[in-house]
């Protein structure tokens, strides 16, 4: 269905392309005018464009002249002139589409066109890359063009201090990674002072390698978390309990859908091992979650595939790039479960402080566009989720690459033997070879065989990635053999004969000179030598057939296969690609189905030798069918993540909007009467609902004492009318507030009200996020009861959010009414505010903020530092009241909707507070 839909939706693409070509003709007509300008005249164009925009001209009106200006500025600064097809790509970006451009077509240069044009509005342009290296490289390289034209450029980097980020965002164009932009948005909605916010809106984003960021990363939400419960022992117990379970008897697993669950037999075994009567009787859902994560860790996540263990630490491997994702941890306890399985230190579980999916983050932009070499296969998803179509941009030169038919072997061993033979033969002929693998295991396996045969080669995987860009840049040298997991080195062109700039640095190092310390004369001499070597090798490599890309396995996504193919044949260069498959490959085994089993049986029946491959259209179709199945499953999973986050996204927008209003000076004093009336009305109805003889006046009085800290309450009897009772309670609360205001002074009270409300919002929101995490973990079980889990989730999330809002205002009143000012709150610095936060979900994370202490303490100094009459601060789980040291009642300070202090996981009103 997605492919069919994509074809229908793409019918207008050719029409758009024709329109873009007409605009290119206008740009080309302006080129002589731009060439005739002096540098000063060309630079003055920017201010003229800004003035015209301010007077009412649209960016579309300015486009031809602006693009012609950038093209000429590029020639004068970095010596590169935009091709016509690059101008088309720039127009596509400006129009809010995804430009699919083949590898080597100069996507980085294309971004300068749309970036410059949209920066003229003054609202800021975000250029998003997949890693810090590319963000820094592109900001410096393309920044030369921007700065020549008077456009400021900002750069976000992993570990950058927050004080340096504000200037970066205030620049006309800001470069950074997707996770850095996303985390900054979340952090902006956790700060306690308006000047600590760094972002200034979401006007326009250009996403480089857009498929990697908006598709591959979309299943993983961005999460800022703090330290939560300590349950390392529980993880270890469950890891032992699930070890040794028998597939299909003790548990059922669907690798295609990434699901696993115990059978009744298996559940009984686990419960016996743990000495637990009924895991599913745990109302908190935590034991069920421990079981689920232990099963996943033991049977679905494998060392050196999804993760590696380095120096006693479990590190995630990006399944699409093969890179280690430093600083990132699986959520919902899965990472701890893997640590327990691998018998390394189990780090304490984190509590979510703020979270958002990449889908919902990028949907906030007024205009979104992107660039990649492979997007058309995901056109339907881009349209459905992001409302952004894909525009295929024709290549500047025809593609000369030869894509050979797949070779399919019966066994994995036979396949790898054939791969090595092919590599050896091409290496001897001087043809460079790039071998793509899907796992670290496979890359190391091929490396071992090549080493035994004396073939020099480079390995790029999650374990060896320090000089990734340099190694991949030289993968086109004569006879070079490079083994890379998937798309390691993406974003770096492979030039036939080698990259002279990288080679020049190597020449200097071989002479004992650090490139940064070399004189200009030394640099020029090294570059001259490198250019001569590269030119000679380029001729030899071209004669040998160009770069050969060998794929050792089809990826689950055709797009990833196309990315691997795209490393060869750039800019009209010759090249070849060849995929080697086996019937034992994961893709074939998991998704091939009965027909693939039939092919295997046929090969066995005719006793075909292991080293004899088959080439048959039926096998190719089966492979494509298997990939199509996986793509549908993965799309459904990403859509599922979005469906669930959409529920919370609306709630997040409400909470963050309220926070920002307070930060921007919203006067809470004006709301006190409304908040008081709505809170007292709700509570009076809760305690005194129905007939008077069923009223819980004692409970109401306890609540009122807890709320205000006073014992001289109005007198209530069963003879009092409900309306009068509600009026008396409201008046009493309002009077208490007025007295507090008079005592502290109105200005002090106004400031404290804002700070207290921020703290209450943050505390309640964190608790709510944790509750939603547990709800999502167990909601899938509702499907067994013939109920739609998503509908159930929406219903319960709505009820929980309603309760959140109600208790939020109640907590605010409770804190403000009982608060005693002892000194002015100490203003917390940005370092204190986020030093305890932990970041997960993106490949690049904030490196100087790894400490895992008490996460909620980041809010402590930001809130009003006050004391109750007993001299203590607010509790962590809620902003509650406080028990006197001589009070024998241990529950006097516990709110009815707070977690019960006994540790059961239930709310207090459903546990020890049931009869109170």
Predicted regions and their residues:
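Conserved P-loop NTPase motor core
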Residues: 1-607, 657, 673-674, 678
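Generic detector of short, well-ordered, non-transmembrane alpha-helical segments enriched
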Residues: 4, 378, 431, 479-480, ...
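Extended, charged helical/alpha-beta scaffold domains that provide interaction surfaces
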Residues: 308-315, 321-328, 548-550, 571-572, ...
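Hydrophobic, well-ordered secondary-structure elements that form the walls
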Residues: 435, 483, 765, 801, ...
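Short Cys/His-rich zinc-binding micro-motifs
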Residues: 890-909, 913
């Amino acid at each position: 269905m997605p492919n069919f839909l994509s074809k229908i939706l793409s019918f207008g693409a050719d029409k758009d392309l024709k329109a873009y070509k007409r605009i290119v003709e206008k740009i080309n007509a302006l080129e002589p005018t731009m060439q005739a300008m002096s540098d000063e005249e060309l630079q003055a164009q920017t201010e003229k464009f800004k003035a015209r925009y301010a007077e009412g001209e649209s960016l579309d009106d300015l486009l031809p002249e602006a693009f012609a200006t950038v093209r000429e500025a590029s020639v004068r600064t970095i010596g590169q002139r935009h091709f016509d097809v690059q101008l088309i790509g720039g127009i596509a970006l400006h129009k809010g589409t995804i430009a699919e451009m083949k590898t080597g077509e100069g996507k980085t240069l294309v971004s300068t066109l749309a970036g410059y044009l949209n920066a003229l509005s003054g609202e800021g342009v975000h250029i998003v890359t997949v890693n810090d290296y590319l963000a820094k490289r592109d900001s410096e390289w393309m920044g030369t063009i921007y700065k020549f034209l008077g456009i400021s450029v900002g750069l976000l980097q992993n570990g950058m201090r927050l004080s340096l980020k504000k200037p970066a965002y205030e620049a006309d164009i800001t470069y950074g990674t997707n996770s850095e932009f996303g985390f900054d948005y979340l952090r902006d909605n956790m700060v306690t002072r308006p000047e600590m916010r760094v972002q200034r809106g979401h006007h326009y984003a250009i996403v480089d390698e857009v498929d990697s960021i908006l598709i591959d990363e979309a299943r993983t939400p961005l999460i800022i978390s703090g330290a939560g419960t300590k349950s390392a022992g529980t993880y270890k117990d469950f890891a032992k309990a699930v070890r040794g379970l028998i597939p299909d008897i003790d548990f059922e697993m669907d690798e295609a859908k990434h699901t696993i669950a115990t059978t009744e037999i298996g559940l009984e075994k686990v419960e016996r091992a743990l000495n637990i009567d009924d895991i599913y009787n745990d109302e908190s859902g935590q034991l069920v979650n421990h079981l689920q994560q232990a099963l996943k860790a033991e049977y679905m996540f494998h060392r050196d595939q999804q993760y590696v263990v380095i120096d006693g630490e479990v590190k995630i491997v990006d399944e699409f790039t093969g890179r280690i994702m430093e600083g990132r941890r699986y959520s919902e306890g899965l990472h701890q479960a893997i640590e327990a399985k691998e018998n390394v230190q189990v780090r304490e579980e984190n509590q979510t402080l703020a979270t958002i999916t990449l889908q919902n983050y990028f949907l906030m932009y007024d205009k979104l566009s992107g660039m990649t070499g492979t997007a058309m296969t995901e056109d339907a998803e881009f349209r459905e989720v992001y409302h952004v179509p894909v525009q295929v941009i024709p290549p500047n030169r025809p593609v000369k690459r030869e894509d050979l038919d797949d070779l399919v072997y019966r066994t994995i061993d036979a396949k790898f033997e054939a791969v090595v033979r092919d590599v050896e033969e091409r290496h001897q002929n001087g043809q460079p070879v790039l071998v793509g693998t899907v796992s670290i295991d496979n890359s190391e396996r091929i490396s071992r065989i090549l080493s035994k045969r004396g073939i020099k080669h480079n390995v790029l995987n999650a374990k060896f990635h320090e000089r990734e860009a340099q190694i991949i840049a030289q993968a086109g040298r004569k006879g070079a053999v490079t083994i890379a997991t998937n798309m390691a080195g993406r974003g770096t062109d492979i030039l036939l004969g080698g990259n002279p700039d990288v080679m020049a640095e190597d020449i200097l190092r071989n002479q004992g000179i650090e490139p940064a310390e070399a004189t200009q004369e030394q640099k020029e001499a090294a570059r001259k030598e490198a250019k001569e070597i590269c030119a000679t090798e380029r001729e030899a490599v071209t004669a040998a057939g160009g770069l050969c890309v060998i794929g050792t396995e089809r990826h689950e996504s055709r797009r990833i296969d196309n990315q691997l193919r795209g490393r060869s044949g750039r800019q009209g260069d010759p090249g070849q690609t060849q995929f080697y498959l086996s019937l034992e490959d994961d893709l074939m085994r998991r998704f091939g189905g009965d027909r693939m089993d039939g092919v295997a049986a046929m090969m066995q029946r005719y006793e075909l030798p292991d080293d004899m491959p088959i080439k048959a259209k039926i096998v190719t179709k089966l492979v494509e069918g298997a990939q199509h199945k996986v793509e549908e499953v993965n799309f459904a999973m990403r859509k599922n993540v979005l469906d669930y986050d959409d529920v919370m996204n609306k709630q997040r927008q409400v909470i963050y909007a309220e926070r920002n209003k307070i930060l921007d000076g919203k006067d809470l004093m004006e709301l006190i009467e409304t908040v008081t009336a709505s809170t007292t009305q709700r509570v009076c109805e809760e305690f005194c609902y129905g007939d008077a003889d069923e009223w819980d006046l004692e409970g109401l009085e306890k609540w009122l004492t807890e709320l205000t800290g006073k014992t001289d309450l109005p007198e209530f009897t069963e003879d009092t009318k409900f309306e009068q009772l509600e009026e008396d309670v409201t008046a009493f609360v309002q009077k208490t507030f007025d007295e507090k205001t008079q005592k502290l002074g109105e200005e002090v009270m106004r400031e404290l009200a804002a700070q207290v409300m921020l703290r209450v919002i943050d505390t309640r929101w964190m608790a709510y996020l944790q509750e939603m995490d547990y709800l999502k973990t167990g909601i899938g079980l509702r499907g067994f009861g013939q109920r739609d889990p998503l509908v159930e989730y929406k219903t319960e999330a709505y009820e929980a959010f309603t309760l959140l809002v109600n208790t939020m205002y109640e907590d605010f009143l409770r804190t403000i009414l009982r608060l005693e000012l002892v000194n002015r709150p100490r203003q917390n610095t940005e370092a204190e505010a986020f030093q305890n936060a932990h970041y997960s979900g993106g490949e690049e994370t904030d490196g100087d903020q790894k400490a895992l202490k008490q996460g909620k303490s980041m809010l402590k100094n930001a809130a009003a530092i006050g004391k109750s009459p007993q001299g203590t601060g607010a509790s962590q789980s809620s902003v509650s009241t406080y028990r006197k040291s001589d009070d024998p009642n241990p529950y006097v300070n516990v709110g009815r909707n707070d977690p019960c202090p006994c540790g059961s996981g239930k709310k207090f009103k459903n546990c020890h507070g049931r009869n109170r």
